[in-house]
Amino acid sequence: MPFQKPDAVDQHIISILEQNGRATNREIAEAVGVSEGTVRNRIERLIRDDVLRIVGVTNPAKLGLNTAAVISISGELSRITDIAESIAVADGVVYVGYTTGNADIIVLAFFPTNDELTEFMTQTLAAIPGIVKAETNIILKPVRSLFPGTTMNVVSRQPPTLAAATPS
């Protein structure tokens, strides 16, 4: 089935789920003014089309991740892809993107302390071939986060097991 651009109903459903990912189809249907079946079908399509993911959003500080950093990376152009891919799998990293301007890559990462950030900079990044410059900015106090779910896998890159994910 071809991709269908989200319409106003889809946007309303998405907006509700952004506020409460555990809202039931019935609750959403009542708020949007459509049937429960319509909500179910729309959510399934949005997920299938990779427009929507339903995830748990964590609070980094509550997980002991008190140091957040935005790191600008400049590198040898022939190695930018390899650099980005190496950084993307490092513990603590939640976002890696190519950029224009003064840096080639932007990284968002969370660590328990400044010492772990320093270790990341001096050991992890220093070991990646092709990095020419890394400029780190520590986030002193977040005002607003538009990245729900960004702290997924910052504690460990190991995926949760079924036993670990099942409430006791």
Functional labels for PLM-detected ranges:
Residues 1-168:
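A compositional/biophysical signature of low hydrophobicity enriched in polar/charged and small residues
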